[in-house]
């Protein structure tokens, strides 16, 4: 959780609680009440998302965020509770949110298969693809995409970059945007300690096999992330070839290469990962951040949001960590809101409430609350009339009056779709390159070499999962014949002894 971790980078200022609550009241009054024609029974909306992935409120008074555009951001109560009030005030109908959490995408999938029922869930891109392929998701309504509706905060505020990503990627001929609304997004890379690791050394997936850092680096303890890193190493020469990078169909070929699950590639990846296991300190899911902060390791495969958290923590302890993006390619990931057919079950009321919930958390002030609370980057950018998200980025990373070595950092690709847009040319200190800003809003040249990991079919999933079992445990195919013969001999002796013992009892 990111709250309170970036104080050194924030602009100073004071805000009275009266202004905070006045602003909150004005926000809640800025839209007219509409009526949903349905029964008057309260709607129960069942939402399931990641743990600590939404603002739970309870902010201290001095945490109020005063932005240069006049907005004041303050988290008093959990957002899902505030949604209930907003829905009643906006649509004249009671809704009750049952909010629960899951630990991993696979946990969520298993919960659904075991009979748990939810209306709205927030899995990662590959699980969204799997649920689409299995016909478990309900498309968003046409009303949800109506840009003339001022309450449709999602379609009016989503980043052009995220919107294009969702619209241009397909599964079974249908775009992701038909079923998914972006929530948080990021990339993967290498969190490193610059005292021991150079930027060049950290800017390649090959760092995990670099003997210089034997037992000082960690990989992720999940097959998709580690397989991606392995592909980056196996295909490094082609991925960094200038002719390949300049080719007209570069992005299509890049995606194909970073999703190669041919038997030959899986076998090569297993052999490589076997070698990497001799060099890494461990496989980890969450402990890598703490290990970097305590100095147990010097480099760590990391998601951009967790990298920001670790850098914030290190700053608080007066030492520096940095984030590098491998030159070969990086994984673009996102988590998105999707509606389940089994939960909505044909109910117009529940679908309307689910879509309204997505819109509510996509309001720019709420997007800022979530980013501040959890430390990840929202898919919401705002628009020409509402620059709250951009102002929050300035509040976090903008250069102060006394700062030196100031640079222009373009982020137009995310906010307007034009990276040369002068309205989104952030003035920041040069030290932010490779730091928090760089992690949350990577430069466009890095985004150009991202690839989304696709949903793999059952056969491919089975193959790479078996590969991962072989890597994490052992591959029975690698056991020498002599060992198998010794095991067989021991088993035969045990059977013979059991037979002798049974025979002696009968006599």
For each of these PLM feature ranges, what is it?
Residues 219, 226-230, 238-322:
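Ligand-binding pocket segment of bilobal, Venus flytrap-like solute-binding proteins
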Residues 339-441, 492-493:
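Mature extracytoplasmic/periplasmic domains
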Residues 94, 103-109, 129-185, 199-206:
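Hinge/lid segment of periplasmic solute-binding proteins
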Residues 40-130, 134:
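Early extracytoplasmic/lumenal segment of secretory-pathway proteins
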Residues 29-40:
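Sec-dependent signal peptide cleavage junction
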Residues 207-223:
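Short loop->beta-strand "edge-of-pocket" segments that line small-molecule binding or catalytic clefts
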Residues 146-152, 270-274, 317-341:
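Periplasmic-binding protein-like
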Residues 416-507:
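Conserved C-terminal helix/tail region of periplasmic/extracytoplasmic solute-binding proteins
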């Amino acid at each position: 959780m990111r709250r309170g971790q970036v104080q050194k980078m924030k602009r100073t200022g004071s805000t009275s609680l009266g202004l905070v609550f006045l602003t909150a009241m004005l926000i809640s009054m800025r839209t007219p009440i509409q009526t949903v024609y349905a029964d008057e029974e309260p709607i129960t909306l069942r939402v399931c998302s990641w743990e600590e992935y939404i603002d739970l409120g309870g902010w201290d008074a001095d945490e109020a965020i005063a932005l240069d555009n006049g907005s004041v951001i303050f988290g008093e109560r959990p957002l899902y509770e505030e949604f209930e009030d907003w829905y009643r005030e906006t649509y004249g109908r009671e809704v009750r949110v049952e909010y629960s959490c899951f630990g991993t995408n696979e946990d969520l999938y298993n919960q659904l298969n075991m009979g748990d029922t939810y209306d709205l869930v927030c899995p990662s891109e590959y699980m969204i693809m799997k649920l689409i392929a299995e016909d478990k998701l309900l498309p968003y309504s046409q009303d949800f995409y109506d840009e003339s509706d001022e309450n449709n905060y999602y379609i009016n505020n989503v980043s052009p970059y995220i919107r294009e990503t969702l619209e241009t990627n397909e599964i079974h001929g249908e775009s992701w945007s038909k079923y998914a609304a972006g929530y948080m997004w990021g990339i993967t890379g290498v969190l490193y300690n610059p005292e021991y690791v150079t930027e060049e050394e950290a800017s390649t997936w090959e760092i995990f096999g670099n003997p210089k850092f034997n037992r000082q680096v960690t990989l992720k303890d999940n097959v998709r992330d580690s397989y991606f890193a392995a592909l980056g190493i196996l295909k490094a020469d082609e991925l960094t070839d200038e002719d390949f990078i300049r080719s007209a169909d570069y992005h299509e070929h890049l995606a194909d290469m970073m999703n190669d699950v041919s038997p030959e590639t899986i076998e090569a990846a297993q052999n490589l990962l076997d070698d990497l296991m001799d060099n890494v300190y461990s496989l980890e899911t969450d402990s890598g951040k703490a290990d970097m902060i305590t100095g147990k390791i010097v480099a760590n495969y990391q998601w951009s949001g967790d990298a920001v958290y670790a850098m914030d923590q290190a700053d608080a302890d007066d030492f520096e960590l940095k984030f590098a993006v491998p030159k070969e390619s990086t994984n673009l990931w996102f988590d998105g809101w999707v509606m389940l057919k089994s939960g909505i079950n044909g109910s117009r009321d529940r679908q309307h409430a689910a879509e309204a919930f997505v819109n509510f958390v996509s309001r720019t002030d709420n997007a800022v609350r979530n980013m501040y609370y959890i430390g990840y980057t929202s898919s919401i950018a705002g628009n020409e009339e509402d620059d709250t998200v951009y102002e929050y980025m300035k509040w976090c990373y903008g250069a102060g009056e006394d700062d030196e070595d100031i640079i222009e950092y373009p982020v137009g690709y995310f906010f307007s779709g034009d990276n040369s847009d002068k309205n989104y040319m952030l003035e920041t200190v040069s030290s932010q390159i490779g730091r928090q800003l760089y992690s949350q809003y990577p430069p466009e040249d890095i985004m150009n070499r991202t690839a989304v990991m696709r949903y793999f079919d059952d056969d491919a999933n089975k193959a790479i999962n078996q590969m991962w079992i072989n890597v994490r445990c052992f591959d029975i195919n690698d056991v020498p014949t002599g060992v198998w013969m010794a095991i067989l001999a021991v088993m035969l002796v045990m059977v013979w002894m059991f037979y002798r013992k049974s025979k002696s009892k009968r006599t």
